[in-house]
Amino acid sequence: MIESLIALIAAIVGLGIGYLVAKKINDAKYEIFVEQAKAKAKAIEYEAELILKDAKNSILNAELEVKKKYEEKTHKIQKDFNQKFDDLSKKEQKLQQEEEKLKEDKEYLCKSQKHIQDLQSDVDKLKNKYQEKLDDVLKILEHSTGLTQNEAKEIILKKVEENSREQIAHIVRKYEEEAKNEAKRKANFIIAQATSRFAGEFAAERLINVINIKNDELKGRIIGKEGRNVKTLEMVLGVDIIIDDTPGAIIVSCFNLYRRAIATKVIELLVEDGRIQPARIEEIHEKVCKEFDSAILEEGETIVMDLGLNKIHPEIVKLIGKLKYRASYGQNALAHSLEVAHLAGIIAAECGGDENLARRAGILHDIGKALTHDFEGSHVDLGAELCKRYKEHPVVINAIYAHHGHEEATSIESAAVCAADTLSAARPGARREVLEAFLKRVSELEDIAKSKEGIKNAYAINAGREIRVIANAQLVNDDESVLLAKEIAAEIQEKMQYPGEIKVNVIRELRAVEYAK
């Protein structure tokens, strides 16, 4: 029984100890749980603070962005407003000038009317005076000659008519001279205004370009083995390449500005690259030609934008850029056309015409010069046909014809273009007749060679003393090349006048290319 009691007491003690241990464990777990809960709460609170901070930053950034956009929009609106205000101010100023001009014209008209009234009064007085004298003379004649009044009246009237005709002719001649002098004075004033308001740049075109090189070793590489590279360059580029004892320089000579510019760029790229060989020359030449086509279009677009013109066909825009590489009597065609455009606009505005239309006609009046190397015909006919094809304004077409006297100028704008063309061309030093005659002669040389069947291209070199003709190897054989050279030489002798002799050099080259795959 004692053992049972001891066992019971032990069980109770064990249960008490177990309860205490369990309670302590539960208390520890509870404390851990509370700590974890607090940690989670702090983490959530921290995360909430971060979210709130991000939200505040987002709101602040949004406010700044909205404020920035608002300021930009406000600035743009203010800028547009200022621009429109300036435009309105200019228009208002122009209207005031026109109003002043109208007032001056009105005053002049009033003075003219008063002058006419005074003249009419003088005529009436003279008429009355002549009538009185006529009556007196009739009485004297009747008394002294025995003539009837009608007969005497006829004699007197005839005499008076003769005297009156002389006086009227004198008055008419006087007013005609005054009108001519006034018109001449006004024309001189308008031309003086136009030339004083426009100052164009002018630089004489050269027939050579000088390329600077670092050392004379490059000259040898450009010449190549047995002159292979320089021959390829001259054949592909169609220019004369002069390599002499001049230190650090190679000269590119050609009458064609476009070919000379391309040749200069090709040689500069080859010198920079260092790989100078026939295949590389052709590769660089093809690349430069594409770049020049893009540059020409860009040049035309810049000119059109600077002149404030619109709705010009892209093909015409490209030809405007191409005028940069054309010259007439030593004067650059694009520079000349720009001068004419600006001067024509000013003259037309002074005469009450459309300034914008006059500038359009001015820039396009010589557009045919961009086509003369590729098509037959005068630049006037080529330019007019081009503008008709692309539906240009009739005033533009009339200006193209009128500036060389093919038609009469039918508008203020056309007349302004004719006057501006004369001003630009007649300016001292603007043109050189001898140079133009030389360019015409070498162009004729190339045209004669190109007119033959089977000819791919032709280049006049050595100042026109040699014509290099590139034959199509698939259309012309070796025997026909000899005949072609003789035919071209014979036609040159028949159609042209020149000092010394001209060498005709027909080149036929056949290339077979295949790729191993």
Swiss-Prot record:
InterPro entries: HD/PDEase_dom, HD_domain, HDIG_dom, KH_dom_type_1_sf, Ribonuclease_Y, RNase_Y_N
Cell location: Cell membrane
Keyword Amino-acid biosynthesis: no
A cellular component term, taken from the record's GO annotations: plasma membrane
Domain HD: residue ranges: 333-426
Enzyme class (EC, first level): hydrolase
One Pfam family of this chain: RNase_Y_N
Superkingdom field: Bacteria
Protein name: Ribonuclease Y
Organism: Campylobacter jejuni subsp. jejuni serotype O:6 (strain 81116 / NCTC 11828)
